[in-house]
Curated annotation (Swiss-Prot):
GO terms for molecular function: ATP binding; ATP-dependent protein folding chaperone. It comes from Grapevine leafroll-associated virus 3 (isolate United States/NY1). GO terms for cellular component: virion component. Its main location: virion. Transports viral genome to neighboring plant cells directly through plasmosdesmata, without any budding. The movement protein allows efficient cell to cell propagation, by bypassing the host cell wall barrier. Two movement proteins, p6, Hsp70h and three structural proteins, CP, CPm, and P64 are essential for cell-cell movement. Also plays a role in virion formation. Together with CPm and p64, encapsidates the 5'-terminal portion of the viral genome. Pfam families: HSP70. This is Movement protein Hsp70h. It comes from the Viruses.
Length: 549
């Protein structure tokens, strides 16, 4: 079985069938799994998602590792800039080998882990949950990344998946995946769509067109430092002014995310319970106050969006909203008010899983199991600096993926350094470096190099000079043996140990029975006659509310 994975900043989703929520794997009752892991002190196991967050909130000794995706692409050269922008409440450092390490939130010794290890541990658990749910082995995956990720950032995810031993069929941009899913289930023809993907940590827009069974990405734009987490931090600052007790920013950040969702779904809600030291406080926060907090972030997203819209003026554009922050009323309203937008499409049922479902559609396409074809394109220009800091274009922005380019260079007798930069600046050193490698010289003092530049379906770059591949010195340091020392624990065992006896007690009292664990199954006539699951579904209980306490 091959899967699509939406590896998100705040939530992640794994899809085994592109049929919406029903084709995604639930973990702790939800297909939207918090992108975090918790390692209890002195334990050889770890938790993910809701179970990880609950262990941290309950004060279990150990460390909660959060936001690994936001650190993709960080090196010794730019770590200070990222720390300044992201303002982490945990330790961040670069080790002697150039690998990025992050610490965790919580108590006990703060063990620093490589970001690729955190990503790998999380994805490994997500895949295990999918295999348990479907009783099928995962053999390959397509993973999504923000549209504005360069080749180096994409390699973080690729390296993490290498640690799993699972081949990556491709790495696709998040808004492209959402568009692929949206168009796969619609009959839209020859219209210009803009997929507005406002996620937890990044904001991206891809402009796409569909003709027959062919979907073509024609332009992408984004901001890697804008997302729902930024809005959460702003809400935290407001809440801190309203409460009298003490509460850590990290714990408040977990609770304000649900407050944001509650207000988006029901503007009549005005009061919220906030945990503080020694108890809880009731805090007033209205939908109007939320709109005021969201406004500057929505304005930033709209400004980025408009830079893309300008390329297609005056053509009308349909905006397809995806990503968790697209659920915010203020964001959707600001997009709808743009003159060039003819329609806003927002599916409240599938919008949060559309990226994972689109990744699965793309996986099926690459495997030859779908009639759809995607022409994906390069988000930024790739250049090679030859002389005088002048960039020579290797792959222009908008080049199809995958693609290849061959160039001949007259070189001297010494080693030759090949460097590739990504970006639109007319000075190479002002763009993001994505490749650096040395081609060793042999033979005559002056010769011709035949260099082949390759851009693969996973978005990474390779260079072959005179038939020999040049090693990229910017390669992300890979995963470590920490993967062998930790075993995923779903938390299901502890939950069942506590919940099943309570469930049996309640069941036997309500129905005057004497059921034991052996009776809990549809094969037992006495139990199946109660039609418990059928009646539960008829009651229309909000399961997320129950699971979130």
């Amino acid at each position: 079985m091959e899967v699509g994975i939406d590896f998100g900043t705040t939530f992640s989703t794994i899809c085994f069938s592109p049929s919406g929520v029903s084709g995604c794997t639930p973990v702790a009752g939800s297909v939207y799994v918090e992108t975090q892991i918790f390692i209890p002190e002195g334990s050889s196991t770890y938790l993910i998602g809701k179970a990880a967050g609950k262990a941290y909130r309950d004060g279990v000794e150990g460390r909660l590792y959060v936001n690994p995706k936001r650190w993709a692409g960080v090196t010794r050269d730019n770590v200070e800039r990222y720390v300044e922008k992201l303002k982490p409440t945990y330790t961040v450092k670069i080790d002697s080998g150039g690998a990025l390490l992050i610490g965790g939130l919580g108590s006990g010794p703060d063990t620093l882990l490589r970001v690729v290890d955190v990503i790998c541990l999380f994805l490994r658990a997500l895949i295990l949950e999918c295999e348990r749910y479907t009783s099928t082995t995962v053999t390959a995956a397509v993973v999504t990344v923000p549209a504005d990720y360069n080749s180096f950032k994409r390699s973080f995810v690729v390296e993490a998946l290498k640690g799993l031993g699972i081949p990556v069929r491709g790495v696709v941009n998040e808004p492209t995946a959402a568009a692929l899913y949206s168009l796969a289930k619609s009959r839209v023809e020859d219209l210009l769509l803009a997929v507005f993907d406002f996620g937890g940590g990044t904001f991206d827009v891809s402009f796409v067109k569909k003709k027959g069974n062919i979907l073509c990405v024609i332009f992408s734009v984004g901001d890697n430092f804008l997302g729902g987490r930024d809005i959460d931090r702003a809400i935290v600052e407001v809440i801190k002014q309203k409460i009298k007790g003490k509460a850590s920013d990290a714990k408040l950040g977990i609770f304000v995310s649900s407050m944001k969702e509650d207000l988006s779904n029901n503007n009549a809600i005005t009061q919220h319970l906030i945990p503080v030291e020694g108890g809880v406080e009731v805090v007033d926060l209205t939908s109007d106050e939320l709109d005021a907090i969201v406004a500057p972030f929505s304005a930033r997203a709209v400004e980025v969006f408009k830079t893309g819209l300008d390329n297609f003026y005056p053509d009308p554009v349909i905006a397809v909203m995806t990503g968790g922050s697209s659920a915010l009323v203020k964001v959707r309203s600001d997009v709808a008010n743009l003159p060039q937008i003819s329609k806003v499409v927002f599916d409240s049922t599938d919008f949060r899983c559309s990226v994972a479902c689109g990744a699965k559609v793309y996986c099926d396409t690459l495997a030859g199991n779908s009639g759809l074809r995607l022409v994906d394109t390069l988000t930024n220009t790739l250049t090679d600096e030859v002389v005088g800091l002048q960039p020579v274009v290797i792959f222009p922005k908008g080049s199809p993926i995958p693609c290849s380019y061959t160039h001949r260079y007259t070189v001297g007798g010494g080693d030759v350094v090949y460097g590739i930069f990504e970006g639109e600046n007319n000075r190479a050193f002002l763009n993001e470096p994505t490749f650096r490698g040395v081609s060793k010289r042999r033979g005559d003092p002056v010769e011709t190099d035949v260099a082949q530049f390759n851009l693969s379906t996973d978005g990474t770059v390779s260079v072959i000079v005179n038939g020999e591949e040049v090693k990229n010195e910017y390669l992300v340091p890979g995963t470590t043996n920490v993967l062998d020392s930790l075993v995923y624990k779903s938390g299901r065992e502890d939950l069942e140990a506590k919940a099943i006896p309570e469930y049996l007690t309640t069941l036997n009292i309500l129905h005057d029975k004497a059921f034991t664990r052996r009776n809990l199954g549809n094969k037992d006539k006495g139990f199946s006659d109660l039609r418990i699951e059928e009646n539960f579904l008829k009651s229309a209980v909000d399961t997320d509310t129950i699971l979130n306490g």
